[in-house]
């Protein structure tokens, strides 16, 4: 089967997140897509202690290798860092979509960070043309659904989907 597109999946943070948590999401994605897409799943540096500078550098490096129209997916803290990295320096090639799963809002009303903050004007700084989808679990205590209301709104946000329970059951 010929692959028709690419998906870059950015993991969440925490010790073992790449191999013991997000790998389940990625394997499910690969299984459902049946090889139609190349799913890239890089290990982020020092996953047990996510650092915006290191992770955003790694994310930008991965995005530079993508084809035009690729889809980027971020989970948890990976989604927050991805969103801020996209707004700070959009990729040269166009994105097909931005998907945020259990993304915490970083800033007033959400998680606090000394490294970065998701500002209210961030949505206007995201790559033009890419549609954005946000998914939150209704019982997610780490990144609760209230964070979705605080998220910056990209110009082409398709919606925010609430899922019963957590994202991963």
What are these regions (language model features)?
Residues 72-73, 98:
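Conserved alpha/beta-hydrolase fold motif
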Residues 46, 164-169:
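Histidine-bearing beta->alpha loop at or near hydrolase active sites
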Residues 73-83:
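Gly/Ala-rich beta-loop-alpha elbow adjacent to hydrolase catalytic centers
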Residues 128, 133-136, 140:
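Short beta-strand/loop motif that positions the catalytic acidic residue
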């Amino acid at each position: 089967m010929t692959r028709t597109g690419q998906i870059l999946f950015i993991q969440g943070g925490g010790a073992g997140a790449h191999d013991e948590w997000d790998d389940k999401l990625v394997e499910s994605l690969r299984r459902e897509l049946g090889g139609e897409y190349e799913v890239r799943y890089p290990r982020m540096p020092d996953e047990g202690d996510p650092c915006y500078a290191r992770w955003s550098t790694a994310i930008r490096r991965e995005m530079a290798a993508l084809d035009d129209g690729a889809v980027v997916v971020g989970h948890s803290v990976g989604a927050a860092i991805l969103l801020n990295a996209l707004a700070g320096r959009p990729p040269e090639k166009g994105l097909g979509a931005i998907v945020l799963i259990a993304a915490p809002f970083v800033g007033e009303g959400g998680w606090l960070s000394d490294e970065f903050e998701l500002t209210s004007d961030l949505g206007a700084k995201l790559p033009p043309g890419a549609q954005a989808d946000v998914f939150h679990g209704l019982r997610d205590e780490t990144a609760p659904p209230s964070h979705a209301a605080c998220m910056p709104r990209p110009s082409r946000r398709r919606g925010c989907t609430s899922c019963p329970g957590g994202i991963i059951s």
